[in-house]
């Protein structure tokens, strides 16, 4: 199973295509300066050289399209078509107290992420843009949200609430 992992920022998009069975990174890259003059994509297939291409990316949707183009490219691509991408995992900075693990993205999850925008105003709105952009390009591919804050949900309560070591 090939999983496209996306970390979407306000003007950048990092990605890796990972084979979940072998855990190998098939390709990775970075779209920079999205919505700004001089935007480019740097793409590196497994075992290959980094390829940097200047390309106009006025929106995140165009950045996602550029990623798919590189992943399926005849020379530097690692899959033949979009059909070989089985799911997309989105790194989400803040899920509040609602999410203790990764979840399949639906309308309720989108609303809950949006409700946390005040907790991560530089990140969550960009994460939502990334999800919507991927949905536009890959409407039939399952999308999963992976929350930074879920890590903290599994900590013992005393470690979560206090910064000092717990008494022995």
What do these predicted regions represent?
Residues 12-57:
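Short glycine-rich, Thr/Ser-proximal phosphate-binding strand/loop in the N-terminal lobe
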Residues 53-81:
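A structured beta-alpha segment of the ubiquitous adenosine-cofactor-binding alpha/beta core
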Residues 162-167:
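Conserved small/polar residues in nucleotide/adenosyl-binding loops
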Residues 123-135, 146:
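Polyanion-binding loop/helix "lid" in catalytic or ligand-binding cores
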Residues 6-11:
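A short acidic Gly-Thr/Ser loop motif
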Residues 1-3:
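Extreme N-terminal starter segment of soluble prokaryotic enzymes
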Residues 71, 77-123, 144, 151-159:
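Short beta-strand-loop/turn "lid" adjacent to the catalytic site in phosphate-handling enzymes
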